[in-house]
């Protein structure tokens, strides 16, 4: 267990807050003369931390005001709502490489809007301009070293965003890590990832007990020990192990529970069995990590498997769609050799939502023409022309335009798509691909303009404005994933009235309805080593079906079906709440639905 080394600081030392800015709720907790830091946050010393209990303010009937003084909806907080702590390596918009960051960016505010107290804990990869130094320091044993760790904090959309500060995460003190969260380049991990994520898990267990947070109008003080932790993917799989060995074995966190969420079963954290000693766990936990497979990487033979341990040691296992949950237990290949363990422990699938504030065609700052379901048929031809002009395609509102947005790798089926383009490009169609990933795939899509100058474009860059323009201006969104736990591209596309042509896998089955909001190609071969000719044929055939409907009344109806759906996080948050309440943590009660407190910050960059 960590040693607390927080000292008593005056407020102006920490994060630059003035004394006038920081006198929020001074009388709520008497903490042995500790000085207030930013926004009412105070360090907690080791004498106080076991005595603190969370207090909740009475909910305001008039709603709260955001930082600009404008009313931004109502949040109804019950005194006995859950204390939820989400732990992950990505939290949008501060740091994300895929769906994990979007989930931890969007789901916590939706649960906060239901009246629960919610925290996220994530590494501090960059110097986020809206996250303040709390001046709380803890010492953690990582491998054979004792490492001091600081906590930074930001309060956004009703959620305490906590960032773990350590040189293993923030490699350049003055600069950005370039979104290289897991390794120096795609497909290559940092050698010390096990130590990095061990530190993250330990810090996440300390945060609810040592951070005295008072930014909310509804809650104050530390979260206490009656907490539900939600660990996300293999990087956080040590959390239930440390909870049991470092805390519950000493009578601490006795009511706390851990839910473990699988966002992508393909990434499991497999390492040499000899590395178990780095984790500082008792030998009795070796069985939870012990794993033998037929692969030579990272070493041949016996290994430790972090995700296996997370599944076996957590109190409940989740994943990000009902159909993906079914796939994970269906066979060895789809469960990636963990299917037996998932069947033993059980799994609950809940579809993701999406950020309907950032992705809103009626207010999208990247679109020249704003629209809703009543004006979509007038707006989309204009937006398609603007998109064609932007990428250098012949401007023609009457030619169908297919878009692809995603990582250029085997999981997303970019190799299948590339093989299929030459077969369907002779049809009356244009295609635009946007994405980054493996160099060989980036080079392939960049050659499309040379091969089909009037038909195709490939942009191997991270380009947010272009992603929004494609989502709005394309007639179809092509999603040829070999497997897709949930997927967000299809949600964004449907929100903007763009039907999807998608593989029948994972969350795509749950969210895209054949003939109603899109077209299903069928399931693809999950073997990423080769391109199955049958999969290529499925793409060609389904593209043909979609193009045959283009311009018809049925197609207009499909566009409106897409836009009429409820795709926000409200529904998923209610489903998550129901299952988390079943864990029976003391003091937990259902929330009351309200609106999110404030819009998400759109830009969080390093301070020079």
Curated annotation (Swiss-Prot):
Its main location: plastid. The keyword Transit peptide applies. Pathway: Glycan biosynthesis; starch biosynthesis. ADP-alpha-D-glucose binds at residue 96. One of its GO terms (molecular function) is alpha-1,4-glucan glucosyltransferase (UDP-glucose donor) activity. Residues 1-76 form a transit peptide. GO terms for cellular component: amyloplast; chloroplast. InterPro entries: Glyco_trans_1 (IPR001296), GS/SS (IPR011835), Starch_synth_cat_dom (IPR013534). One of its GO terms (biological process) is starch biosynthetic process. Keywords: Amyloplast, Chloroplast, Glycosyltransferase, Plastid, Starch biosynthesis, Transferase, Transit peptide. The keyword Transferase applies. It is found in: Plastid, Chloroplast; Plastid, Amyloplast. Transmembrane segments: none annotated. Its EC number is 2.4.1.242. It catalyses: an NDP-alpha-D-glucose + [(1->4)-alpha-D-glucosyl](n) = [(1->4)-alpha-D-glucosyl](n+1) + a ribonucleoside 5'-diphosphate + H(+). Required for the synthesis of amylose. Belongs to the glycosyltransferase 1 family. Bacterial/plant glycogen synthase subfamily. This is Granule-bound starch synthase 1, chloroplastic/amyloplastic. It comes from Ipomoea batatas (Sweet potato).
């Amino acid at each position: 267990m960590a040693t607390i080394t927080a000292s008593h600081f005056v407020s102006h030392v920490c994060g630059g807050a003035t004394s006038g800015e920081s006198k929020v709720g001074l009388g709520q907790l008497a903490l042995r003369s500790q000085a207030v830091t930013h926004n009412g946050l105070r360090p907690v010393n080791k004498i106080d931390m076991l005595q603190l209990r969370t207090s909740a303010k009475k909910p305001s009937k008039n709603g709260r005001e955001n930082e600009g003084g404008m009313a931004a909806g109502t949040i109804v907080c019950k005194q006995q709502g859950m204390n939820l702590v989400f732990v992950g390596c990505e939290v949008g918009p501060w740091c994300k490489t895929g769906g994990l960051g979007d989930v931890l960016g969007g789901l916590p505010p939706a649960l906060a809007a239901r009246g629960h107290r919610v925290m996220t804990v994530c590494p501090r990869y960059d110097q986020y301009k809206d996250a303040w130094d709390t001046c709380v320091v803890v010492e953690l044993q990582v491998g054979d070293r004792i490492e001091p760790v600081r906590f930074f904090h930001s309060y956004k959309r009703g959620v305490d965003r906590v960032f773990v500060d350590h040189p293993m995460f923030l490699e350049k003190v003055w600069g950005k890590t370039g979104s290289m969260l897991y390794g120096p380049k795609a497909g290559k991990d940092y050698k010390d990832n096990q130590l990095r994520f061990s530190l993250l898990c330990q810090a996440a267990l300390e945060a609810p007990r040592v951070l005295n947070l008072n930014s909310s109008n509804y809650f104050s003080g530390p979260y206490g020990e009656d907490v539900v932790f939600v660990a996300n993917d293999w990087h956080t799989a040590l959390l239930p192990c440390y909870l049991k060995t470092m805390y519950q074995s000493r009578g601490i966190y006795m009511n706390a529970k851990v839910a473990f969420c699988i966002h992508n079963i393909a990434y499991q954290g497999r390492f040499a069995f000899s590395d178990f000693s780095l984790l500082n766990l008792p030998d009795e936990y070796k069985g939870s990590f012990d794993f033998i497979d037929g692969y030579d990487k990272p070493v041949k033979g016996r290994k430790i498997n972090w995700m296996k341990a997370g599944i076996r040691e957590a109190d409940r296992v989740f994943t990000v769609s009902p159909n993906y949950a079914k796939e994970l237990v269906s066979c060895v290949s789809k469960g990636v050799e963990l299917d037996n363990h998932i069947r033993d422990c059980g799994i609950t699938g809940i579809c993701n939502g999406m950020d309907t504030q950032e992705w809103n065609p009626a207010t999208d700052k990247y679109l020249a023409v704003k629209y809703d379901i009543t004006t979509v048929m007038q707006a989309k031809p204009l937006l398609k022309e603007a998109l064609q002009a932007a990428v250098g395609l012949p401007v023609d509102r009457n030619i169908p335009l297919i878009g692809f947005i995603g990582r250029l790798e085997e999981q997303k089926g970019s190799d299948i798509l590339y093989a299929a383009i030459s077969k369907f490009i002779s049809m009356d169609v244009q295609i635009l691909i946007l994405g980054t990933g493996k160099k060989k795939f980036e080079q392939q899509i960049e050659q499309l303009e040379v091969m089909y100058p009037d038909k195709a474009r490939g942009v191997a860059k991270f380009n947010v404005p272009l992603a929004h323009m494609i989502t709005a201006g394309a007639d179809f969104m092509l999603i040829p994933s070999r497997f897709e736990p949930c997927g967000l591209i299809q949600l964004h596309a449907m929100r903007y009235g763009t039907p999807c042509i998608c593989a029948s896998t994972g969350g795509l089955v749950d969210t895209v309805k054949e003939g109603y909001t899109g077209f299903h190609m069928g399931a693809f071969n999950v073997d990423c080593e080769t391109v199955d000719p049958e999969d290529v044929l499925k793409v060609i055939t389904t593209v043909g079906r979609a193009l045959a409907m283009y311009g018809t009344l049925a197609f207009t109806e499909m566009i409106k079906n897409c836009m009429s759906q409820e795709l926000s996080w409200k529904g998923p948050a209610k489903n998550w709440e129901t299952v988390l309440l079943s864990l029976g943590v003391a003091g937990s009660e259902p929330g009351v639905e309200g609106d999110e407190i404030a819009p998400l910050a759109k830009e969080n960059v390093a301070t020079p």
